[in-house]
Amino acid sequence: MKTDNGGQQALLAEHELILQEPEWFRKAIENKPENRFVPFRESQLHYSFWAGPSADAQNIVLLHGDGAHAHWFDFIAPLLTPYYNVIALDMPGMGESGWLDGYSREIMAEAMIEMIRHANFSSKPAFIAHSFGGMVSLITAHHYADELAALMICDFHVKAPDVHHEWYSDIESWRPTRVYKTREDAEARFRLAPEQPCENHFIVEYIGSHSVREVQIGENGLRGPSEEAGWTWKFDPSIYPGFTVGYDLPEIYKSIPLPVAGMFGGASHDFDQISRRDVIAYMRDLRPDAPHYDISGARHHIMLDQPRAFASAVLAQMEFWRASGAFQK
């Protein structure tokens, strides 16, 4: 077992951890995507592309959460490509995308639409986004709804203003990410955020192996010359000070002129001031036209906990949208 990640896996009994990659997973990650890069704000963006059955097939855009990357979907996208073309995006400052001089939710949304445009789909795509990516997808749909067909947010909770909490309000300054001497040391410290146990330990290890990068002494990738060589995390720590999620998300969610859906982990976490069920009830009130449903057995990181159920739910929602004419607009 490579990961020693803050005790999150220790919450599970040894017999609950699945250590060996099952056949479906091995076959999925053997389906390698095409890596594509897009110039953006004196930097570049990266996304992964998996071809579907034809260029004329409908299209899916997948977006990761905070501090994550497109590789979170390496084993999800191939489950969708028998039916759809799929891209998985790296947000600016995360994964293989470059770092920017500054970040905001609007800049994130601009980056998303630039990659979607670069994919040059034959028809408007459905946007499926997880956690922090769910917020970014809402802002993207708010500004660029005419370039999207539908939107699904996955375990991102739109809260009423009186219980909304700005995620990064207590981060006044950033610190360079820690540098570990070896790749193995870095991977052993990988942990999910928010932290949770995950029975699919083979997936946690796979994600961890794609979450680190090598740095050399004097390299400027850490927002300043690194004083040591080794391995560190791929995300830019300067994203968070001053980053605003916004109190206007309920109005944005309510008014997006697209079919929407919400997928949630049935075992995901509650919040300090309100339960997850109460938040989902609030979201249903905002969008009574939209399905909001749980994936049984999944915590916050749905695609890690229940990957095939996650993919099946996406496929079912895509078929519902097709039948209701969402892709004909």
Where are these regions (language model features)?
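Conserved alpha/beta-hydrolase catalytic His-Asp/Glu region
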Residues: 181-246
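Catalytic histidine-centered segment of alpha/beta-hydrolase-like enzymes
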Residues: 295-307, 311
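Gly/Ala-rich beta-loop-alpha elbow adjacent to hydrolase catalytic centers
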Residues: 129, 133, 137
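Conserved HGGG/HGGXW glycine-rich cap/lid loop of the alpha/beta-hydrolase fold
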Residues: 46-96
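Alpha/beta-hydrolase fold catalytic core
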Residues: 1-60, 82-84, 121-122, 281, ...
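Conserved loop-alpha-helix segment in the C-terminal half of the alpha/beta-hydrolase fold
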Residues: 255-298
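Active-site loop/oxyanion-hole signature of alpha/beta-hydrolase fold enzymes
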Residues: 28, 40-43, 48-50, 88-128, ...
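Flexible "cap/lid" loop of the alpha/beta hydrolase fold
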Residues: 138-142, 149-183
